[in-house]
């Protein structure tokens, strides 16, 4: 059998390279991974990208890009529609296509290719079920062929590779050996001898054969997978389609689809296959997959030799990898972090396989004659072999000899293929060498020119080198000087260490004192607790004493209640006497009420009569006056408005005749007329106001009458007070007399006020008159000013305005007459108001005489009543004296009981005072010193820290010891010229690491010595610089002490140290 379809291309075809399509599918976590708490470290971040992490919290990620990536939630139908569905059309067009699943064991390869469900006749390649790619592809092919309505045949085969042994899963004879041979007619293809291809006609036939193959396939249970595939399988589908050619000749189109399910790579320890046959299976599986990886690497690197023959698996897939087949790879991986190494290996191989290029070619369409001829030749060949075997007249060889010839032939073919590949590789290498030679020739010319430039630069560099050597010598000397400085600092550090130990000893002593102080505080706390308990006990005793005092108070309260009842009885008796007195008083009150009612009735009648007459006269006079005045005002207003309208009409006629000349005059004249109207209207309003003021002036008369009525009401109130205050009748009578005299005085005062109000009204009338005269004057002045203005305008204007001036003069005369008329009417109104007030004054005099008569009569009656009531009050006083004597006795008894109770309470308080003294003297504890509390002391420790001498002094002495007279002893080690800067920087880089570290110690000015900063070795200043201490506010700090030990604080007043010694100053 030919795995590639067994057809050769006899016509030249257009070849185009095509990369292998690579897909990745990530399965979800299974139950085993959930049990071992394996975390997901693989993420599908896009339709084409996969990101992996070594651990869940790792920030280092690796991203792979493929043609398509499927996440854990992807379905079987999604994978098929993307990967295999496009290949079905290519198969029907006559291409050979291959799809194989690659990955670690237990990642879902068999699930993807075969599925977990058994395919049924009603199953469709588009439904959402767990059937795999193989049954979906067969169903899809049958559906497409049925819709094409062509004649076709379909044959399938199911090949298994187990422990490098081939097996036909659909064959009924297990003894048949299957071999692989290279196809001499088609380079890169193999022929599988002994593999049975079974024709199928429906989906049912295919599903039955597929189930048969699944049952015969080698599977086993491992720790990684309950049904782990222990072999590789290749499911091949060959489709022959009959179609008519251009000349009407029958043509046969052949397409082939290989669906490969590879066994997964395994780790022996993880899978639990350390013993037995499983070890051999694992070794063979891993060996074949390793060879597949090497083939992929060789194809990607375009190596001259691809190791197809090192494994039967790679020989089966030879045409699919780098051949004439359209190939797709599905890489299945696990998302758990326990399998991250295998996952990364699978992703890297799959990512590398993307670069493999195939050259897909359409299988040649064969005519019916060609097919029959091939079949006839093959039948004749088989017949001859059969006859030779029967007749035994052919060439017979020993089995060993035949085996040697076969092996020799295979080795020669293998060697020939290798030589051909080697020759091709040598040719490619020769082309590369020629290309390199041309490039080298071109670069040689460029290098020659560069060499000349380099020689010139060399001469310049030699001069620079001499200068650099000098700088290097100086730099080495400076290095030694810095080394000497470091040694001085080390000596200082040793002294500082000794001082630090002394300070730590003082700190330990202070710590011990602190612990003893804490013990003292604890003892005082315990003493406070005892005092608190004593206070609680004292509180309980005092509470008992207070309860006893409360009991005595309750007893005293009961005694007071009994006395209260006795006093209540006496009060009842007194109330009986009071009731009798009240009865007598009520009779007297009734008599007084009758007398007061009579007096009140007389006063009320008199008051009503007076009010009626006054109001009648006032209403008649006011109404007549207002009506007359309003009628006159309305008549005058109508007359004035008519006259003004007439004058305006005349003026308007004149203006129409002289419109062009009198526009400005018309506006001014209209303004004057409007002001006149406004003054007339304001005058009318003021007249209304004056009338209202006159009406308001009549109101005081009504208010005086109202006051009289209120005085009568006061009389009634006084009578009621007499009824309520019979217990002090005599005093009330005197008060009534006084009030009546006051009322008489107030009535006379009110009459005087009425007289004053009359005079005030007369004055107001005079003011109104003067106001009217003022308005008259204002009107005359306004008219005169208007006349003067109009006269000036007329003189400056046209003669046609003479008539308007005449009208204005008539209006002025009319206004004067109107003012005189208003003055006359106002005088008449003033006279009528005076008559009205005279009448009111007469009525008030009569009312006053009548009120005095009523008052005299009331006084006589009251004197009679007072005498009778005084006799009754004397009798009741004697009865009250008897009741008061009894009440006095009861009060004395109450005082005696109170004295006894007070004595008892005094005794209880003495007991409480004794308890308090006992608590203070015996129970209340005080603190007793133990003698362990530390006393105040002075801690002795170094208060002045050592410091290193100035760097200039150290360097100067060091130079004198070494007798370096060639250097300037007055210069510091940091000086360098500007011209040496660049060279010194290169020289410093050539020093050792120790030298570079030493150069990081800068020199700071000390004791007024100025240190010059250059640009060489003092560029890196850091916090380790030695600085002199500064005494500010009694505190000193040292940079050296900060870098070596914690900072120290000197007490106030400690002297600042001065550096003046050679090496160290204490």
Curated annotation (Swiss-Prot):
Residues the record lists as Phosphothreonine modifications: 520, 933, 1045
Effect of mutating residue 23 to F: Spindle defects and greatly reduced phosphorylation by Wee1 in vitro
Modification(s) after translation: Phosphorylation is required for localization to mitotic spindles. Phosphorylation of Thr-933 during mitosis controls association with the spindle apparatus. Phosphorylated in vitro by Wee1.
Entry GO MF terms: ATP binding; cytoskeletal motor activity; microtubule binding; plus-end-directed microtubule motor activity
Ranges in coiled-coil conformation: 362-462, 540-569, 639-738, 808-875, 889-918
PTM-bearing positions, type Phosphoserine: 949, 1043, 1050, 1054
Residues the record lists as binding ATP: 103-110
UniProt keyword Chloroplast, yes or no: no
Keywords, in A-Z order: ATP-binding, Cell cycle, Cell division, Coiled coil, Cytoplasm, Cytoskeleton, Microtubule, Mitosis, Motor protein, Nucleotide-binding, Phosphoprotein
InterPro entries: KIF11-like (IPR047149), KIF11-like_kin_motor_dom (IPR047241), Kinesin-assoc_MT-bd_dom (IPR025901), Kinesin_motor_CS (IPR019821), Kinesin_motor_dom (IPR001752), Kinesin_motor_dom_sf (IPR036961), P-loop_NTPase (IPR027417)
Alphabetized CDD domains for the sequence: KISc_BimC_Eg5
Pfam family, one: Microtub_bind
Signal sequence annotation: none
Record's keyword annotation contains ATP-binding: yes
Main location: cytoplasm
Biological-process GO terms, alphabetical: cell division; centrosome separation; fusome organization; Golgi organization; microtubule bundle formation; microtubule-based movement; mitotic cell cycle; mitotic centrosome separation
Residue ranges, compositional bias (Low complexity): 1033-1051
Subcellular location: Cytoplasm, Cytoskeleton, Spindle; Cytoplasm, Cytoskeleton, Spindle pole; Cytoplasm
Region spans: Disordered: 990-1009, 1016-1066
Polar residues bias (residue ranges): 990-1002
An example Gene Ontology CC term for this record: kinesin complex
The protein's role, per its UniProt record: Important role in mitotic dividing cells. Microtubule motor required for spindle body separation. Slow plus-end directed microtubule motor capable of cross-linking and sliding apart antiparallel microtubules, thereby pushing apart the associated spindle poles during spindle assembly and function. Forms cross-links between microtubules within interpolar microtubule bundles.
Assembly and binders: Homotetramer. Consists of two pairs of polypeptides associated by coiled-coil interactions to form two homodimers. The homodimers are linked by lateral interactions between their coiled-coil regions to form a bipolar homotetramer consisting of a central rod with two motor domains projecting from either end. Parallel coiled coils extend from each pair of motor heads, switch to two antiparallel coiled coils in the central region and then back to parallel coiled coils. Interacts with Wee1.
Annotated protein name in UniProt: Kinesin-like protein Klp61F
Phylogenetic lineage: Eukaryota, Metazoa, Ecdysozoa, Arthropoda, Hexapoda
């Amino acid at each position: 059998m030919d795995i590639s379809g067994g057809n050769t291309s006899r016509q030249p075809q257009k070849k185009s390279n095509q990369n292998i399509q690579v897909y990745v599918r990530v399965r979800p976590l299974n139950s085993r991974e959930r049990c071992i708490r394996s975390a997901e470290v693989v993420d599908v971040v896009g339709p084409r990208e996969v990101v992996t992490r070594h651990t869940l919290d790792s920030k280092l990620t690796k991203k792979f890009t493929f043609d398509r990536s499927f996440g854990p939630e992807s379905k079987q139908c999604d994978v098929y529609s993307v990967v295999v569905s496009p290949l079905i059309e290519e198969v029907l067009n006559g291409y050979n296509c291959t799809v194989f699943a690659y990955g670690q064991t237990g990642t879902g390869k068999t699930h993807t290719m075969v599925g977990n469900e058994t395919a049924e006749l009603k199953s469709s390649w588009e439904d959402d079920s767990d059937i795999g790619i193989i049954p979906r592809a067969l169903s899809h092919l049958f559906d497409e062929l049925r819709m094409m309505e062509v004649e076709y045949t379909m044959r399938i085969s199911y090949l298994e590779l187990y422990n490098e042994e081939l097996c036909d899963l659909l064959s009924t004879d297990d003894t048949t050996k299957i071999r692989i041979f290279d196809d001499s007619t088609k380079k890169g293809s193999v022929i599988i001898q002994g593999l049975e291809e079974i024709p199928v006609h429906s989906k049912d036939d295919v599903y039955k054969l597929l189930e048969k193959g699944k049952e015969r396939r080698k599977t086993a249970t491992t720790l990684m997978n309950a049904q782990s595939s222990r072999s590789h399988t290749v499911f091949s589908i060959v489709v022959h389609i009959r179609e008519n050619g251009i000349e009407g000749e029958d043509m046969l189109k052949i397409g082939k689809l290989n669906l490969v399910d590879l066994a997964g790579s395994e780790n022996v320890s993880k899978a639990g296959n350390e013993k037995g046959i499983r070890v051999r299976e694992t070794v063979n599986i891993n060996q074949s997959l390793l060879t597949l990886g090497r083939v992929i690497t060789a194809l990607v690197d375009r190596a001259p030799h691809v190791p197809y023959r090192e494994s039967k698996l790679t020989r089966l897939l030879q045409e699919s990898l780098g051949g004439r087949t359209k190939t797709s790879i599905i890489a299945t991986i696990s998302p758990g972090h326990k399998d991250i190494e295998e996952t990364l290996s699978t992703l890297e191989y799959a990512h590398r396989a993307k670069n493999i290029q195939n050259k897909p070619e359409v299988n040649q369409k064969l005519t019916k004659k060609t097919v029959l001829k091939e079949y006839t030749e093959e039948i004749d060949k088989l017949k001859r072999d059969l006859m030779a075997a029967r007749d035994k007249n052919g060439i017979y060889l020993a089995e060993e000899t035949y085996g040697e010839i076969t092996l020799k032939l295979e080795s020669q073919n293998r060697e020939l293929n290798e030589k051909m590949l080697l020759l091709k590789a040598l040719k490619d290498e020769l082309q590369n060498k020629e290309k390199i030679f041309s490039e080298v020739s071109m670069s040689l010319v460029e290098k020659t020119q560069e060499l000349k430039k380099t020689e010139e630069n060399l001469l310049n560099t030699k001069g620079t080198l001499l200068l650099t050597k000098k700088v290097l010598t100086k730099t080495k000397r400076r290095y030694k000087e810095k080394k000497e400085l470091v040694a001085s600092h080390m000596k200082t550090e040793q002294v500082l260490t000794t001082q630090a130990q002394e300070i730590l000893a003082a700190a330990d002593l202070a710590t011990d004192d602190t612990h003893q102080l804490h013990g003292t505080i604890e003892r005082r706390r315990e003493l406070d607790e005892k005092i608190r308990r004593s206070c609680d006990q004292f509180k309980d005793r005092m509470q008992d004493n207070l309860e006893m005092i409360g009991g005595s108070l309750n007893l005293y309260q009961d005694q007071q209640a009994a006395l209260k009842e006795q006093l209540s009885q006496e009060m009842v008796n007194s109330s009986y006497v009071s009731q009798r007195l009240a009865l007598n008083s009520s009779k007297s009150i009734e008599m007084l009420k009758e007398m007061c009612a009579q007096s009140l009735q007389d006063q009320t009648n008199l008051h009503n009569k007076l009010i009626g007459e006054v109001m009648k006269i006032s209403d008649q006079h006011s109404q007549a006056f207002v009506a007359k005045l309003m009628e006159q005002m309305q008549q005058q207003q109508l007359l004035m408005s008519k006259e003004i309208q007439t004058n305006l009409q005349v003026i308007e006629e004149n203006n129409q005749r002289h419109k062009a000349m009198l526009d400005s005059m018309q506006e001014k004249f209209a303004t004057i007329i409007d002001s006149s109207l406004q003054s007339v209207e304001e005058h009318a309003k003021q007249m209304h106001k004056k009338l209202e003021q006159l009406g308001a002036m009549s109101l005081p008369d009504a208010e005086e009458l109202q006051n009289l009525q209120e005085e009568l009401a006061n009389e009634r109130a006084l009578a009621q007070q007499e009824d309520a205050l019979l217990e002090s009748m005599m005093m009330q009578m005197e008060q009534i007399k006084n009030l009546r005299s006051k009322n008489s005085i107030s009535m006379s005062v009110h009459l005087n006020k009425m007289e004053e109000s009359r005079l005030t009204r007369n004055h107001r009338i005079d003011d109104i008159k003067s106001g009217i005269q003022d308005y008259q004057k204002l009107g005359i002045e306004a008219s005169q000013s208007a006349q003067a203005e109009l006269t000036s305008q007329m003189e400056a204007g046209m003669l046609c305005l003479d008539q308007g001036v005449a009208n204005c003069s008539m209006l002025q005369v009319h206004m004067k007459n109107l003012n005189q008329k208003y003055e006359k009417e106002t005088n008449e109104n003033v006279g009528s108001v005076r008559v009205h007030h005279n009448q009111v004054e007469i009525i008030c005099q009569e009312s006053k005489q009548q009120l005095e008569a009523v008052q005299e009569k009331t006084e006589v009656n009251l004197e009679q009543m007072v005498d009778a009531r005084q006799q009754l009050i004397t009798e009741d006083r004697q009865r009250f004296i008897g009741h008061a004597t009894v009440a006095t006795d009861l009060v004395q008894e109450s005082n005696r009981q109170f004295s006894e109770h007070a004595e008892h309470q005094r005794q209880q308080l003495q007991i409480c005072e004794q308890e308090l003294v006992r608590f203070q003297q015996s129970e209340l504890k005080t603190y007793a010193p133990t003698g362990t509390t530390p006393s105040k002391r002075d801690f002795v420790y170094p208060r002045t820290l050592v410091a290193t001498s100035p760097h200039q002094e150290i360097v100067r002495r060091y130079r004198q010891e070494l007798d370096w007279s060639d250097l300037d002893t007055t210069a510091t080690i940091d000086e360098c010229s500007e011209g040496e800067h660049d060279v010194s920087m290169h020289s410093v880089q050539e020093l050792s690491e120790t030298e570079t570290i030493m150069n990081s110690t800068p020199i700071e000015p000390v004791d007024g010595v100025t240190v010059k900063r250059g640009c060489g070795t003092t560029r890196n200043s850091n916090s380790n610089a030695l600085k002199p201490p500064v005494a500010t506010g009694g505190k000193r700090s040292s940079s050296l002490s900060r870098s070596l030990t914690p900072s120290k604080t000197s007490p106030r007043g400690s002297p600042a140290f001065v550096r003046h010694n050679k090496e160290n100053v204490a």
